[in-house]
Amino acid sequence: LYLYADAYGDEVMREYAWELFQQVYDGVHTDMPVGLERGLAGIGYGTTLLCKRGLVECSLNDILEDIDRKIMERDPRRLTDMSVRSGVRGLMLYLDLRQSVEAVATFDSRYMMELQDTVARNNLPCRALDVMDVLNEPTFPETEYIERPLGIDGGCAYYILKSILV
């Protein structure tokens, strides 16, 4: 919503996006999964993307410190899910984006080394991913959006995000 509000100069949408952003942070709890799609890495990724695009001003190391600490509670050597949506590759997508914005001070070097070892041990591709690589493209043409799913994954919002990020 922030990207949409910025692209179209919609202040009402920007205020609504801010309210939703705060609700996400209020909803963070200790037993959340670490994944990109429904977990802590996704919250971190979204926050980092907003900061990178200049839509929120913050120190990522300050605002994401608690989230990063909760992620580090999971031993990277014991992670078995290597997927983008809920596993190691999604965590790497988040960290790669973070490092592209500012030096990541909230993850300790040992954790990062153990995570890299997990990536190497499982022969995960080293190429950087883009969020669009993770999402499913809708099965309907962009012009036929009426009465279609609204979501970002396989829905109408996919086309909006794609046009904004290009």
Segment roles from a protein language model:
Residues 6:
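Alpha-helical bundle segments that constitute or directly flank the non-heme di-iron/ferroxidase center
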Residues 66, 70, 88, 92-166:
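Terminal, non-catalytic domain-edge segments
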Residues 15-106:
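Extended ligand-binding groove/face enriched in aromatic
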